[in-house]
Every structure is written in C-alpha cells, then in structure tokens.
C-alpha cells in the first residue's frame, strides 16, 4: 500500500478517487461561495493537487496561478480542469519556496497542503509556520487556508500537536477560524475501506470494514485572513 506522500507523487488516480467521494453534501463549495467574492479575481492556489479546491471557484475567477510540487498530480489536475485551460497557469513549486515568487494575487488559497509541510518539518516547524503565514499575507489581500480537523473522528479536533500548533498560530496572526463537515460517502463499506485505506492506511481501513461504514465523518477547518 503506498504511503500518503507516495500517493501525491505517483498515484494521482487513487487520490482523485478519494477526493471524489469527499464532502458529499458540498459544504466546502457552499462555504467558499457564500463567504468569498471570486468574481474576476486573480487567485494563487498552492498545493492544487487534482483540482478539488479549484473546482469550487475557477468558473468565477479571472485567472488562477496553480502551484504544486508534483508534475504527476498537476497532469491529473489539467485533465480535471480542462474546461478552464485558458484561465489556469500551472507551475511546479515546493511550498518551502513561496518566497521565490514575484507574483501578487488578490486571493491566495491552499487546501490540505501546507499542513503536510508543517508535519514534516520537525527541526524548524515554528519558523516554517511563520514563513507560510508571512509569505502568503504579503502576496494577497485575502488568504484562505483549508486544513484537516480530523477524518473518521467523532468531533472536530486537530489531528496531532503539530497541526494544533499550526492552527493556533493562524488565529494568533489574525486569521478567523471556521469549521465545516466534509464527510465521505461510498456505495458500500468495502469500497470505503479500499479507498480510504489506500490513502490513510490499514488502521483506518480495518476500522471502516469492522464497523461497516459507508459514510466516513470528516471535519475541515477554514482559516481566513483579510
């Protein structure tokens, strides 16, 4: 079974299959389009993945600059977002390298991307968190961070001390926090176990199959600075 980071680099179809079952009530779309004015905006999106966040606003934005560190996953995003080819410019960049960009945007958004860098960086985590905050705030009038508040959890909580530190820093730096439900829905528990386990690991797979879950609860945090 591939690990989470291997999935991003080499298994875009598996990742896309996962996110296509996520948020079956469409709560992220409802939130982003009720609270953010996207019309004719220049948007920078970091960690575009297969385009799941982008689909929520791309039809309204004037231009999207899409960044990811994996050409493999960008290729999948290009397929998923082929209706908006003229509106999107793709670039390969690691989130650590945001400071190298000269671009300015009206809105910056990232979804389930910066958190991975925070979790990976054990030596300079505090500095990495502040870099992500400072470099995005200086490049856009509005900044939106979307990160996990727990998958297969009974209530919303940061999954681990590292992400908790990240989320507290966002609030301390002027971001407002919002929590939504982004539950997964599958046709049967075998499918749920296969797909969720392929990304989150055997422990989640076994729990889903043992409890015969077809709907997997998930909470998502949205932090907005403007």
Where do the language-model regions lie?
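A short, conserved alpha-helix within the catalytic core of class I
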Residues: 117-134
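Short catalytic micro-motifs in class I SAM-dependent methyltransferases
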Residues: 112-116, 147
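Class I SAM-dependent methyltransferase SAM/SAH-binding core
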Residues: 44, 50-97
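Conserved class I S-adenosyl-L-methionine
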Residues: 1-39, 142-169
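Short amphipathic alpha-helix with an adjacent loop that forms part of the alpha/beta core around
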Residues: 98-103
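A conserved beta-strand element that flanks and buttresses the S-adenosyl-L-methionine
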Residues: 109
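Conserved Class I S-adenosyl-L-methionine
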Residues: 50, 178-226
């Amino acid at each position: 079974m591939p690990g989470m980071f291997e999935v991003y680099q080499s298994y875009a179809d598996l990742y896309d299959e996962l996110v296509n079952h996520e948020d079956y009530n469409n709560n992220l779309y409802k939130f982003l389009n009720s609270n953010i004015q996207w019309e004719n905006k220049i948007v920078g999106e970091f960690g575009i993945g297969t385009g799941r966040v982008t689909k929520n606003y791309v039809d309204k934005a004037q231009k999207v600059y899409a960044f990811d560190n994996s050409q493999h996953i960008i290729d999948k995003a290009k397929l998923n977002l082929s209706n908006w080819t003229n509106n999107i410019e793709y670039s390969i960049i690691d989130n650590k390298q945001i400071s190298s960009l000269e671009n300015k945007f009206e809105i910056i958004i990232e979804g389930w991307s910066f958190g991975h860098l925070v979790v990976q960086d054990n030596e300079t985590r505090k500095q990495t968190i502040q870099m992500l905050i400072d470099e995005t705030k200086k490049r856009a009038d509005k900044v939106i961070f979307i990160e996990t508040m727990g998958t297969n959890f009974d209530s919303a909580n940061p999954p681990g001390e590292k992400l908790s530190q990240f989320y507290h820093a966002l609030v301390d730096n002027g971001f407002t926090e919002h929590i939504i439900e982004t539950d997964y829905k599958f046709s049967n528990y075998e499918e749920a176990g296969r797909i969720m386990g392929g990304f989150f690991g055997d422990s989640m797979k076994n729990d889903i199959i043992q409890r015969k879950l077809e709907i997997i609860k998930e909470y998502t945090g949205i932090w907005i600075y403007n």
